[in-house]
């Protein structure tokens, strides 16, 4: 066994399909150039997490010592560790160092990237890096603790990278983007929320609507298919219209908020071809599709209403091991 190993995974934006993917609709998701890195070092006592964003947390190793209350921040990592142990990896004391360029709790997949990078680095420390299939399965155990009923799309894109068409229970399909001359603007509302709470709220509204909600989900699925074709054909104008329609559907099920709508309309007023929330909603981030020559105006338009904003490129590479 090595003394340490390091791995990273990309963040993501959901172009269309968040929430609806939970009940079988299509989602289009893209990895972005911002990455999260995890370094695992053996030694010490128990399991220790060190993160500039999440602080320092520690706990006994699973199955060792008296039962102790574990920080909610550590619980997903422990779930991943248990899954690794079930696959034959030895459980040893170690420290997890997290370095992230992905804002946490913002809908950009930081949680999934962290679970993926942790699972890959821990398995690599033992000299046997997980395969992509096993990496997905192990990381999902952590996401279930973090989010309750994750669709799996965040973990999939963190493992694979690129742009994917994703439907729950089916193999993801790689999309070859034909878009040129456009870029994504990402603006953070600065409002933190628990993904699990938003997912449960949206599902409760869908259930309350009864049969009517089936038409909303059907429309979301059709919109996602149109988005796939627009991306492949390079039709940015059409993709923008589709993003706007998707925002309306998400709002109808209670996923939006005043902060989100403010950023959406500021981007549209600044020339965005389309703008919508990405991720769970109730806060987190908004994405806007801009022509490259107009994105600076978009950045200026969201300065006062966002905690941070940046342009995002598509990351072709998913999870990877890294040298020290």
Swiss-Prot record:
Enzyme class label: transferase
Segments passing through the bilayer: none
Substrates-to-products reaction catalysed: (R)-mevalonate + ATP = (R)-5-phosphomevalonate + ADP + H(+)
UniProt xrefs under Gene3D superfamilies: 3.30.230.10, GHMP kinase, C-terminal domain
Positions annotated to bind ATP: 103-113
GO CC terms, sorted: cytosol
Pathway participation: Isoprenoid biosynthesis; isopentenyl diphosphate biosynthesis via mevalonate pathway; isopentenyl diphosphate from (R)-mevalonate: step 1/3
Any one GO molecular function term: ATP binding
Cofactor(s) for this UniProt protein: Mg(2+)
InterPro entries referenced in this protein's UniProt entry, alphabetically: GHMP_kinase_C_dom (IPR013750), GHMP_kinase_C_sf (IPR036554), GHMP_kinase_N_dom (IPR006204), Mev_gal_kin (IPR006205), Mevalonate_kinase_arc (IPR022937), Ribosomal_Su5_D2-typ_SF (IPR020568), Ribsml_uS5_D2-typ_fold_subgr (IPR014721)
Compartments in which it is found: Cytoplasm
GO biological process, one term: isopentenyl diphosphate biosynthetic process, mevalonate pathway
Keyword Phosphoprotein part of the UniProt annotation: no
Stored SUPFAM superfamilies: GHMP Kinase, C-terminal domain (SSF55060), Ribosomal protein S5 domain 2-like (SSF54211)
Coiled coil (residue ranges): none
Active site, renumbered: 154
A Pfam family assignment: GHMP_kinases_C
EC assignment: 2.7.1.36
Similarity field: Belongs to the GHMP kinase family. Mevalonate kinase subfamily.
Subunit structure of this chain's protein: Homodimer.
Its biological purpose: Catalyzes the phosphorylation of (R)-mevalonate (MVA) to (R)-mevalonate 5-phosphate (MVAP). Functions in the mevalonate (MVA) pathway leading to isopentenyl diphosphate (IPP), a key precursor for the biosynthesis of isoprenoid compounds such as archaeal membrane lipids.
PANTHER family for this protein: MEVALONATE KINASE
Protein name as catalogued: Mevalonate kinase
Gene symbol of the encoding locus: mvk
